[in-house]
Amino acid sequence: MTSVQIDDDAVIWSASAADREGRPLLVLLHGFNSNEGDLFGLSPYLPLEPVIASLRAPLHAGPGFAWFPLLAQGAEMAIEGADAAVDAILAWLDRAAPDATSVGLLGFSQGGAVSLELLRRAPERFEYVVNLAGFVLPGERAGDGDARLAELRPPVFWGRGTADPVIPEASIERTRDWLPSRSTLDERIYEGLGHSVSERELADVAAFVRAQVAPVA
């Protein structure tokens, strides 16, 4: 797949450039057929400590955008697309947030999958991941990212609903098998929740993020 880029002008920030210095960063990655404004709507529920940056995925998908082609179109195409998205996000971090004191990721659905791919590619670059209704993509990856994750065990919040009609059971099972040995996992299952985020889940996410960005005593 050809290379892609993050549109700097489409990024929604919670703080001005002057107010971002010396603060942790939380990057929001939306789901398939959505846009940067979607997850940014969650920002009032999130802790104030991190600067929030909500990115727009680079591929057009209907009226919205996507990080990679759907798995239903073929695993190889999806993985190649996700790999290109990871390249684009890492390049964006280099130019837009080189001085962030730490970087966390929060992704929904396909954005959750990309957040885990970022963790696999650059395990030491990210402090934590919030994976909402997301999943891990199949297959092995080049390099030693997975082995390094097994050593580092970064904090990962994985929230999902029991009534999600979108994410296949096979993807859930694959994620359930993959995450525990490669993260310090906080798995939450919400009864009756579909492919969305509930207020209860948001409260749990806020507590999780707050614990990750709290100053060390």
Protein language model regions, located:
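Short beta-strand/loop motif that positions the catalytic acidic residue
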Residues: L152, F157-R160, D164
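Serine-hydrolase catalytic machinery in alpha/beta-hydrolase-like enzymes
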Residues: T2-T101
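Active-site nucleophile loop of the alpha/beta-hydrolase fold
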Residues: L55-L59, V130-P138
